Amino acid sequence: MKVIIPVSPINSLKTRLSEFLSSEERKNLLLNMLRDIKKALEGLDVVVVSRDDEILDFAKYELKAEIVKEKYKGLNNAIKQAFDEIDDEEVIIIPADIPLIKKKHIEDILKLSKDYDLIIASSRGGGTNLLYLKSKNLIELRYEGFSFLKHLEEAEKRNLRYYIYDSFLISVDINTPEDLGEIFIHGDNTYTKNYLKGLGIEVEPKHSSAGRFVVKRR
């Protein structure tokens, strides 16, 4: 089994955070999120696919991951390229921005994989934040947009045995300043939280219907 992590180029990272974090800070945020994800994947073979050489060097030398230099545009094409370059059939695909994922989640997925062809966990926005496939070509990948529903549609169309893994922590992907608040609440002992605290970022509750947090910098 391989775990595939597609990573966007550094120059296009987390643009919705650009008014809150500099480009260098966003890069370091990503690297720390990858450290947290790799910690959860201890004992598994990880493959990072990216077109960015700095990301690939980090993955190879710090994360000790296999690397695939992305050749084609689009998330689905990047993952398919990784499929073509690995021998393993069983795969788990996860994004690079879910630093709250834990080893316990992965242990659950591995146990469930004995009984199911496909296991999926959604993002809060209807995306796919974890996808296990017993065989890498089992379905047509349909990332982007409401991919959670699209992947379920693929599973049902093929009469696959599938399981919806419900996890708030996996559902949290980091795209906006408010998302950082979840790290402060749920991310104790993570590289990501420690990095954000070092930037002087603070989170306070918001007593209104317009969001849950006030995220600010000292």
Swiss-Prot record:
Recorded metabolic or biological pathway in which this protein acts: Cofactor biosynthesis; coenzyme F420 biosynthesis
Keyword Lipoprotein among UniProt keywords: no
The keyword Cell membrane is assigned to this record: no
Catalytic reaction equation(s): (2S)-2-phospholactate + GTP + H(+) = (2S)-lactyl-2-diphospho-5'-guanosine + diphosphate
Broad class of enzyme this protein falls into: transferase
One annotated GO molecular function: GTP binding
Annotated keywords: GTP-binding, Nucleotide-binding, Nucleotidyltransferase, Transferase
Stored SUPFAM superfamilies: Nucleotide-diphospho-sugar transferases
Protein's GO biological process: F420-0 metabolic process
EC nos: 2.7.7.68
Function, in words: Guanylyltransferase that catalyzes the activation of (2S)-2-phospholactate (2-PL) as (2S)-lactyl-2-diphospho-5'-guanosine, via the condensation of 2-PL with GTP. It is involved in the biosynthesis of coenzyme F420, a hydride carrier cofactor.
PANTHER family to which the protein is assigned, alphabetical: 2-PHOSPHO-L-LACTATE GUANYLYLTRANSFERASE (PTHR40392:SF1)
Subunit structure comment from the entry: Homodimer.
Similarity remark: Belongs to the CofC family.
Name of this chain's protein: 2-phospho-L-lactate guanylyltransferase
Organism from which the protein derives: Methanocaldococcus fervens (strain DSM 4213 / JCM 15782 / AG86)
Lineage: Archaea, Methanobacteriati, Methanobacteriota, Methanomada group, Methanococci
Name of the gene encoding the protein in the UniProt record: cofC
